[in-house]
Amino acid sequence: MMLSEQAQKWFPTHVQVTVLQAKDLKPKGKSGTNDTYTIIQLGKEKYSTSVAEKTLEPVWKEEASFELPGLLMQGSPEKYILFLIVMHRSLVGLDKFLGQVAINLNDIFEDKQRRKTEWFRLESKQGKRIKNRGEIKVNIQFMRNNMTASMFDLSMKDKTRSPFAKLKDKMKGRKSDGVFSDTSSAIVPSTHMPDANPEFSSGEMQMKSKPKKPFLLGPQRLSSAHSMSDLTGSHLSSEKLKSSTVGPTHLLSRQIDSFGVVPESGSLKSPHRRTLSFDTSKLNQPGSIVDEGEHSFGRQSDPFTNVTASLPQKFATLPRKKNPFEESSEPWDSSMNLFSKPIEVRKESKREKREKVSLFERVTGKRDSRRPDKLNNGGSDSPCDLKSPSAFSENRQDYFEYESTNPFTAKFRASTIMPSSSFHVNPTSSEDLRKIPDNNPFDATAGYRSLTYEEVLQELVKHKELLRRKDTHIRELEDYIDNLLVRVMEETPSILRVPYEPSRKAGKFTNS
C-alpha cells in the first residue's frame, strides 16, 4: 500500500467494548439463579464487570477500552481476538463457567463498521460437549485517540531512594520541593528571576506576554469575548479618525487611506492619551456644534452609518459608539484651544471612567444608578463646568453613547440630539434649521453626503470585502460545528440521553 493511499484511510488505535446484558443462562446457583459477571480480555489485558446477583438475565452496561498493539487494517496478518467469558461467582470453591465467546475484530473492521451491537451465542470450552448456554449482547466500537503532547506528563517522578541517597542530597543542599532536585521536566515552571540583569528580565517578560495563536486561521481570528473587551481601543481610534477629518477634502481622503489599512491580526494601536485629549478637545467645541447645525443638523441619521474601515474586522458584528458632533470648523480651532488646555486633566479622568465600562453594560445596555442622576443634574459637579465649552459636549456624548447607540436598550433612537437652551446659537442659523424638512430617521446615506465619489467607492469596496470575509468565516465555523457534532454523536451517543447517564467502567485485573 502506498503512503498516499494509507494516509487517506482511517485506522483505529483503541477498541471500546461495552457488555450490555445476557439472557438464557444455565442456572448454577442453589436457588436456581446465578451471580454472574463477565471477563473481557484482549491480548494480555483483562477487565471484569460487576456481579449481577440472583438473576438469569443479568444487565451490566459496563465498558472497557483496549489499546490495539498494532495497526488494524484490511489484510493484516495479525489477528485480534476479543474473548468474553461469563462466570458464576461461587462463595465456596472456584467460580463456575457459564459460557464464552471469541470475537474476531479483524472481520468487524473489514466490514467497515466502526460500531457494532449484536447478540453473540455463548459457546462451551474446547473439547467439551456443545450445548445451548445462552447469549450475550455486546457493543464494539473502534476509536482513534490522537495522542498529543498535552496528554502526557513529561515530568519524571521521583524514584524510591535509599536513606544514604537522601542523606547525600541533604549534604549537597538539595531540597525536597523539586526546585534543586535531580528531576527533569519538559515543561519548565516560571520561577523568580534575579534582578542583576533588568534588561534581560524585561525582554523575557515581553516574550512571555505574547498571545497564543488562535485556533482558526481566518480574518476574524479572535473570539467575540476578546473583541468586546477591546471596544475601548476601537473607540479611541475612531475618535482620532474623526478629529483628523477637519480640513480640506484631500486631507480627508489621505486620512481614510492611512487609517483604512488594517493589519491582519485585527488590532489597531490606540493613540497616545495626551494627543487624544488634544484632538477630542477640538471635537467638543461649540463651534463644531454650530457648523454641524448649519450643514447637517435636523437630518435623521443612522448611528451605525459612520463606521469606517479603520475599525478592526473583529468589531464588525458589534454596535459602535457614534459621536454626534462629527464636523468642526477651522475658525474655532485657534480660539478654543485656550479653553481646552486648562480642562485637559479633567477630561482625561472622565475619559478613563468612560473606557472602564464593563462588558455586561455593553451587551445588556444597563448602567449604574449613578449615571442617570448625573445626567439629570446637568452632568457636572460644579457650576464652572457648565460654563466650560466642553461640558455640554462631554455630557451629550455620554448620553448619546449609552442611550442612543445601544440597540439593546428600549430607549434606542437614531435621531440627532438637539442643543440645549443654554447653548447660544445665532438667529440666522436657527431660521435655516427650521426650513430643513425632516427626512427618514433611518437614512443610510446621511453619513456619506460629505464624501466624494472616490471615497464612497473605497468605502463600498472595503465593506464588500469585509462581508465576504465574514461570510467565509461563518461558513467555516458552521462546518466545524457540524463535523464536531457528528463526531460526538458517533463516538458517545449516550451523551444525548435525557437525563445523561455516564457509562460504568469495568474493573481491570492486576497481575499479582
From Swiss-Prot:
Region of interest (Necessary for its cellular translocation to the plasma membrane), ranges: 15-102
Extent of motif NPF 2: 406-408, 440-442
Annotated region Disordered: where?
A: 174-231, 263-287, 347-390
- The highest taxon in the source lineage is Eukaryota
Question: From start to end residue, where is composition biased (Basic and acidic residues)?
Answer: 347-374
Gene3D superfamilies in the record, alphabetically?
Answer: 1.20.5.2440, C2 domain
Location of the C2 domain = 1-120
Q: Does the keyword Cell membrane apply?
A: yes
**GO BP term, pick one:** insulin secretion involved in cellular response to glucose stimulus
Q: Where is this motif: NPF 1?
A: 323-325
Q: Which CDD domains match?
A: C2_Rab11-FIP_classI
Q: What does this protein do?
A: A Rab11 effector binding preferentially phosphatidylinositol 3,4,5-trisphosphate (PtdInsP3) and phosphatidic acid (PA) and acting in the regulation of the transport of vesicles from the endosomal recycling compartment (ERC) to the plasma membrane. Involved in insulin granule exocytosis. Also involved in receptor-mediated endocytosis and membrane trafficking of recycling endosomes, probably originating from clathrin-coated vesicles. Required in a complex with MYO5B and RAB11 for the transport of NPC1L1 to the plasma membrane. Also acts as a regulator of cell polarity.
What is the protein name for this chain?
Answer: Rab11 family-interacting protein 2
